């Protein structure tokens, strides 16, 4: 799966929660699968990830055991966000929805629309910042 597995085992030790270790490793597996080679992920002071060799732009998202990785052309920002379906989104909707934005009903509930709004805005934020 990944060459130099001892390096990845060492990196996983930074996390105490098992699900965070798996997410961290899954990001590296996806990155290796997409690029065909090992890539070092570095982080800006803001926490935004990037490839240390600047061979591509990078965006990462993870939630509850799922991860997503997107690569783009060097210097062209990309963004990705994944969210797990859940009613919790209603409790935080005021943080990402303006008063003049109304979620539509999709699949019989507005939960999907709220999640779509949240994820779309998070993706754009990652692209622009």
Segments and roles (model prediction):
Residues 1-129:
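Core catalytic alpha/beta fold that binds nucleotide/phospho-ligands
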């Amino acid at each position: 799966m990944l060459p130099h597995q001892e390096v990845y085992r060492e990196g996983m030790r930074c996390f105490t929660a098992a699900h965070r270790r798996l997410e961290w490793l899954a990001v590296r597996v996806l990155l290796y699968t997409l690029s065909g080679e090992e890539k070092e992920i570095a982080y800006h002071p803001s926490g935004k990830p990037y490839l240390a060799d600047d061979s591509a732009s990078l965006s990462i998202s993870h939630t509850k055991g799922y991860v997503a990785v997107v690569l783009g052309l060097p210097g062209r920002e990309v963004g990705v966000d994944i969210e797990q379906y859940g009613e919790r989104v209603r409790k935080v909707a005021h943080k990402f929805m303006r008063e003049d934005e109304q979620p539509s009903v999709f699949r019989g509930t507005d939960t999907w629309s709220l999640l779509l709004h949240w994820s779309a805005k998070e993706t754009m934020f990652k692209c622009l910042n």
